[in-house]
Regions:
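Accessory terminal regions of nucleic-acid processing enzymes
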Residues: 1, 52, 56, 190, ...
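A cyclin-like helical interaction fold
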Residues: 78-92, 186, 191-196, 213-215
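Metal-dependent nuclease catalytic cores that hydrolyze phosphodiester bonds in DNA/RNA
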Residues: 1-126
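Alpha-helix initiation/capping motif
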Residues: 14, 38, 75-76, 139-143, ...
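Mg2+/Mn2+-dependent nuclease catalytic core
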Residues: 94-207
């Protein structure tokens, strides 16, 4: 008996991994391969937690110099400066703010959820910002991770009829790089329906297709 897509377990379609949007078979092919973390990723997590604490407490990251984050990472002046760059940017933005907001995009892709670093509502614009602590330059234009977070942030708002535009922002302190991209809300939702949903359905199929590409 041929296996149907109903027999396929729900894979977690991660916003940070765009391979499933480009190559539906990549998720099932990687099933069973353990996730590996790196020191850079763990430091990034520690810096995100430091920034979140400072934003919620209204204090400078310098106040945590000498402390440890995640019981492992010493907060040095250099690491404080990285967090401060992002904290200062967020603090200077007008609007209603939420930090490290859990978002779900499961109405577009089963199991697709994540955490948006900062979500800011101001007039008719919804800003979704992402702190990147690495040295590889990342741009906001057509950034699928941020676009998915944008869909999730909209889901978090009971009535988003007042929102006209989604502003997606990448903040990279170590590169002194801030990049932003604007997309109309209706265009983003259309992308969710016309790109994300079909890609998720193909990923969940019993025999998903493979479309290997450098971007995936």
């Amino acid at each position: 008996m041929q296996q149907s897509e109903l027999d396929i377990p729900i894979y977690r379609l991660r916003p940070s991994n765009k391979s499933w949007l480009l190559c539906p078979g990549s998720i099932q092919a990687s099933e069973g391969i353990p996730d590996e973390t790196t020191d850079a990723a763990e430091l990034g997590t520690a810096l995100h937690e430091l920034a979140e604490l400072c934003l919620k407490q209204g204090v400078s990251p310098d106040s945590y110099i000498g402390y440890k984050m995640n019981q492992e990472w010493d907060i040095t002046q250099e690491r404080s400066d990285i967090a401060a760059y992002y904290v200062d940017w967020v603090n200077n933005e007008p609007g209603t703010k939420q930090y490290e907001l859990p978002v779900t995009m499961e109405n577009y892709a089963p199991g697709c959820r994540g955490t948006a670093d900062a979500v800011i509502e101001h007039t008719d614009t919804l800003t979704v910002a992402d702190l990147k602590s690495g040295m590889g330059r990342v741009n906001a234009t057509d950034n699928t991770q941020l676009m998915l977070y944008g869909l999730g942030a909209l889901n978090d708002i009971a009535d988003h009829s007042f929102i006209d535009t989604i502003r997606l922002v990448i903040v990279q302190p170590r590169l002194d790089h801030i990049d932003q991209w604007y997309i109309k809300k209706d265009e983003l939702i259309k992308w969710g329906h016309e790109v994300v949903r079909p890609a998720a359905a193909k990923t969940m199929a019993a025999d998903p297709e493979f479309n290997p590409s450098p971007a995936a």
